[in-house]
Structure formats: C-alpha cells, structure tokens
C-alpha cells in the first residue's frame, strides 16, 4: 500500500459511513480528515432529483460565496472602449479582444474565469470549442455575458462559483479551503445549497435534493444530514 493510500485509509477510519452528519460535525470531520501538505479545497457534491437529459430539468447558475474561495481568481474580460477601462478599474487581470482570442488559439489559458460584453460574443464564439470544454465560455445564464462589467469582475474576484448539473444528476462545487474556519465553510455551503434550491426547475418532480456530501481534495466523502442543511437556509 502506498503512503498516500495509507493516509486515505487512516482518514477514512475517522468517518462512520452508515450515518449522516449535521453541518457542524461534517465540517469538523472534513478538517480532521485532511492530510495533504497543501491547503486542500473543500468540495461539495449534491445529487439532485432531476434528469439533465431533458432540457427542462437542467440546473445551472452561479452564486457568490459570502466568504470567498481562499484563492486569487484570475479574471479575463473580452471588451473594448469604455468597457475595457471599466474592467481594468474593477480589477480584471486581462482585458482585450481579438488579441486575447489569438493567444487562446495558441494554447494560452492562464485565467480562471472569462467575462464578455454581449457585443464581443461574435469574436469569442471563434474559440467556443476551446473555452467550452474547460468551463470557461462566457454565458448570460451565469452573468458572464453582460455590459455590467465592473460588477461581474468584482463578483468573480470575491468568490463567484458557477454550477451545472452533470449527466448523473450531480452538482460539484468548491466551498473554500480546509484552512477556513468552520463558520466560513458553513456560510459558503449554505449559500451554495440555497442557490441550488432557487434554481430548481419547475419540471422537477419528487424529492429535489437527494444527497449532499463534502470532502477535502484528498480526503474521503462525508454524507450530510439534508434536513439540517436545508433548515438553515
């Protein structure tokens, strides 16, 4: 057994897989079970009662986590003229148009999120096949295609998380770092779940939130008490 496998096994022993944990206890266990030498990300997986194969059951959106993500988010903006200046003033790391498209076509992806003004989407569309698979394509549904450039940049810098349900009906999203205090992780978790509840499709029938689990990057998953989570949002 490798050293990593031994550490994971030891971390797993801290968890009772037959039970669901209240939010506070789950966060405590996740922090205790983290064993990597780096500051692990805390991830949440939510299984929803939807079938994303049907367009009317797609769940997609974004939420600004109240306590951020604990990392410097590199923001790229496709804009010209006054909106270019607005983006720079708001703290965007890269702003441009065709010049940025050319860099991306050459294999440059040194950014975490991309924003575009609506008039730039004709240009951005040229690299849709490069941005889309990486989750970087600007989209009006999550507020990254907008003329409100300053707000979009500031939200991204503050810890905006985009979410989209996968084929299996699961949404994955980060809610912070292991080094965060428990209240900060809890606040981010509740904000994410609340956003998912608000994004519930009208076509979704039956139980909507079926399972919530939390883990650190290298750690085992912990199942949360859904009732405890939803009672706090």
Curated annotation (Swiss-Prot):
Q: Which Gene3D superfamilies match?
A: 3.30.190.20, 3.40.50.790
Gene Ontology terms, cellular component aspect? cytosolic large ribosomal subunit
**What start-end ranges are recorded for coiled-coil regions in this protein?**
none
Q: Which InterPro entries match?
A: Ribosom_uL1_bac-type (IPR005878), Ribosomal_uL1 (IPR002143), Ribosomal_uL1-like (IPR023674), Ribosomal_uL1/biogenesis (IPR028364), Ribosomal_uL1_3-a/b-sand (IPR016095), Ribosomal_uL1_CS (IPR023673)
Q: Which domain of life is it from?
A: Bacteria
Alphabetical keyword list: Repressor, Ribonucleoprotein, Ribosomal protein, RNA-binding, rRNA-binding, Translation regulation, tRNA-binding
Return the Pfam families for the record: Ribosomal_L1
What GO molecular function terms would the record report? Answer: rRNA binding; structural constituent of ribosome; tRNA binding
**GO BP annotations, alphabetical order:** regulation of translation; translation
Primary role: Binds directly to 23S rRNA. The L1 stalk is quite mobile in the ribosome, and is involved in E site tRNA release.
UniProt-listed HAMAP family: Ribosomal_uL1_B (MF_01318_B)
Concerning its family, UniProt says:
Belongs to the universal ribosomal protein uL1 family.
Q: How does it assemble?
A: Part of the 50S ribosomal subunit.
NCBIfam families referenced in this protein's UniProt entry, alphabetically: rplA_bact
Protein's name in the database: Large ribosomal subunit protein uL1
């Amino acid at each position: 057994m490798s050293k990593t496998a031994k550490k994971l096994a030891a971390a797993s022993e801290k968890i009772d897989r037959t039970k669901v944990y209240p939010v506070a206890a789950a966060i405590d266990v996740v922090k205790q079970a983290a064993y990597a030498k780096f500051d692990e990300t805390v991830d949440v997986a939510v299984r929803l009662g939807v079938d994303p194969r049907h367009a009317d059951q797609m769940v997609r959106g974004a939420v600004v986590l109240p306590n951020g993500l604990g990392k410097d988010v590199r923001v790229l903006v496709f804009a010209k003229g006054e909106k270019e200046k607005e983006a720079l003033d708001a703290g965007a790391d890269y702003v441009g148009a065709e010049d940025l498209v050319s860099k991306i076509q050459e294999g440059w992806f040194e950014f975490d999120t991309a924003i575009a003004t609506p008039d730039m989407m004709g240009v951005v569309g040229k690299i849709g096949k490069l941005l889309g698979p990486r989750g970087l394509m600007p989209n009006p549904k999550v507020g990254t295609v907008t003329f409100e450039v300053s707000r979009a940049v500031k939200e991204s810098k503050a810890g905006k998380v985009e979410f989209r349900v996968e084929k299996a009906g699961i949404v994955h999203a980060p809610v912070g770092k292991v080094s965060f205090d428990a209240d900060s992780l809890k606040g981010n978790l509740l904000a994410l779940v609340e956003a998912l509840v608000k994004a519930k499709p009208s076509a979704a029938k039956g139980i909507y939130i079926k399972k919530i689990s939390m883990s650190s990057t290298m750690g085992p998953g912990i199942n949360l008490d859904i009732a405890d989570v939803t009672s706090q949002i």
